[in-house]
């Protein structure tokens, strides 16, 4: 007879958020390098459970252990016990349900909240919609897909996310971001 656990575990994230991804295998015992997208790299371990997608299906994975190794962080997942098993997970995104993330203070937001926001200059020129965010060494960057009839013939704009300097106002209610930016760039 199989014993069923009374603890109900989520089968799939309701509102999936990517927190990082698994890199190449390390050693022969199933360890993997991990790349964290969280502001403080180690914070990725604070949010559980983790999910991955294999062949279009969600799978929950259990973190057994993690440690620093040289410049990398490496992880050991439960049931991943050799290099071959670890290699199957290389490049898998590490996903959690948004309910695992901390509640934000008034006026704060996650990158995911900015996706799809309309970006308008302080002069009222519509630059387009946020389609992605990029991390650079110095600051984050909004990737904005320009409108089809953009007067400057621009398809995509990269606008530095410099709060106060370039970013003048973020309004998640109206899904808009006001920026001090030359539309010709």
Curated annotation (Swiss-Prot):
Domain called PRC barrel: residue spans: 106-185
Keyword tags: Chaperone, Cytoplasm, Ribosome biogenesis, rRNA processing
Residue intervals passing through the bilayer: none
GO biological process: ribosomal small subunit biogenesis; rRNA processing
PANTHER family for the chain: RIBOSOME MATURATION FACTOR RIMM
Family: Belongs to the RimM family.
Protein name as annotated: Ribosome maturation factor RimM
